[in-house]
A protein has these predicted regions:
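A generic structural signal for short, well-ordered alpha-helical segments in conserved domains
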Residues: 2, 162-163, 257, 261
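Beta-strand->loop->alpha-helix junctions that form or flank phosphate-binding loops
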Residues: 13-15, 107-126, 176-180, 190
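Phosphate-binding loop of NTP-binding sites
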Residues: 1-94, 98-108
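Short internal beta-strands
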Residues: 90-94, 226-227, 245-257
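Nucleotide phosphate-binding/pyrophosphate-handling subdomain across enzymes
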Residues: 145-247
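Short, charged/polar "capping" segments at the starts of alpha-helices
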Residues: 96-101, 118-121, 233-235, 256-260
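Acidic-glycine-rich active-site phosphate/pyrophosphate-binding loop
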Residues: 124-143, 185-193
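Cofactor-binding loop segments of dinucleotide-utilizing enzymes, especially the Rossmann-like FAD-
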Residues: 17, 115, 228-230, 253-255
Length: 261
């Protein structure tokens, strides 16, 4: 999102779970600037205000070691749009059952994104792999998904969500330009090095099964996955069948969930 705004000539203040905190930068934020903020469930759970534009890419079990149950986790996510007004915009994932169920609570303009179906308003991926935006004014074909530099169908979904969120603020031409140039973020399928014919990738931000599976589907080659870390008390059932080769473990979660041949 920040790259799109920067390409459009806007001054952007970026804050998220990794990197510099945004609050100390508040004195530098002018009314015409844009703040792009990634918010965790820990921050959302106590929020009583919502942003002008809210994008929820998907919801899957996570951080259940910190939340009393899955419903509390989902309710925290809902605060992203619960306090919006009629002039706000909310973008939800049509393909995710949990985010689809949030639609009835949205107060502002609702937009969808989907890689599986044509939506009535928002963005979608057609059967030829072309990204589209559709609304009351018509259906605009944007660019083939092969133009997206970073790998993985989950990144196609991310671009669909972002385009729906920024439509009207960024030109269609810039969407394609940034898609070709954006190389991704640290720790998310980040290429580290190639050694003895083996390419090493850092996907350590994939700290739940849904994100890990998305990373696995980003590659056509055979993989060796080293997984583990802190156990967040979430179900791992879906991950086992997806790991079809070797697996190694490290950290608290390694032994109980170590995959076998």
């Amino acid at each position: 999102i920040s790259k799109f705004y920067e390409a459009a000539g806007r001054k952007v203040h970026l804050g998220g779970n990794i990197g510099a905190a945004l609050l100390p930068m508040l004195p530098e934020v002018a009314p015409e600037d844009v703040a792009v903020v990634e918010l965790s469930s820990f921050q959302l759970i106590s929020m009583r205000r919502s942003p002008d534009t809210a994008l929820i890419t998907n919801v899957a079990p996570n951080h259940l070691d910190m939340h009393k149950d899955m419903q509390e986790y989902v309710d925290a996510k809902k605060n992203l749009y619960r306090h919006q007004d009629a002039f706000s915009r909310t973008v939800l994932n049509w393909d995710n059952d949990i985010t689809r169920s949030m639609a009835e609570e949205v107060r502002g303009d609702l937009y969808w994104f989907s890689r599986r179906e044509t939506v009535s308003r928002g963005t979608y991926l057609d059967t030829d792999g072309v990204l589209h935006h559709i609304d009351e004014t018509g259906d605009v074909a944007l660019f083939p998904m092969q133009e997206i530099r970073i790998p993985g169908m989950h990144n196609v979904e991310n671009f669909l969500g972002v385009i729906a969120a920024l439509w009207g603020e960024v030109s269609p031409e810039l969407f394609c330009t940034v898609a070709r140039e954006f190389a991704g973020v640290e720790h998310r399928i980040e290429f580290v090095r190639e050694l003895d014919g083996v390419k090493w990738y850092n996907d350590s931000i994939a700290s739940n099964p849904t994100r890990t599976i998305a990373g696995l589907y980003s590659f056509n080659q055979k993989l060796c996955i080293i997984a583990g870390g802190y156990d967040k008390q979430i179900p791992y059932d879906a991950l086992g069948p997806e790991i079809v080769e070797h697996g190694g473990g490290a950290g608290e979660a390694a032994d109980p969930h170590r995959p076998h041949r």
